[in-house]
From Swiss-Prot:
GO terms for biological process: cell differentiation; spermatogenesis. MORN repeats lie at residues 15-36, 38-58. Keywords: Cytoplasmic vesicle, Differentiation, Nucleus, Repeat, Spermatogenesis. It comes from Mus musculus. SUPFAM superfamilies: Histone H3 K4-specific methyltransferase SET7/9 N-terminal domain. Expressed strongly in testis, where it is specifically detected in haploid germ cells (at protein level). Also expressed strongly in skeletal muscle. One of its GO terms (cellular component) is nucleus. It is found in: Cytoplasmic vesicle, Secretory vesicle, Acrosome; Nucleus. PANTHER family: MORN REPEAT-CONTAINING PROTEIN 2. It comes from the Eukaryota. Pfam families: MORN. This is MORN repeat-containing protein 2. Coiled coil: none annotated.
Amino acid sequence: MNGFGRLEHFSGAVYEGQFKDNMFHGLGTYTFPTGAKYTGNFNENRVEGEGEYTDTQGLQWCGNFHFTAAPGLKLKLYM
């Protein structure tokens, strides 16, 4: 698949965004079965670059993501 699409996994996880060669690639949103979600850049099925993670409590964390590491994430505060 290439272009924009939606993939629903039997676990309840959902990816909606850009695909390239059947992989998550470009901008997209991955929603975990728990309700947490990541919105941002993907590169060959991996989170890579600028993005935002919303945890199960609704707290939003933004910054640079590099596969399994996300050094320097910042918590977004709304005042």
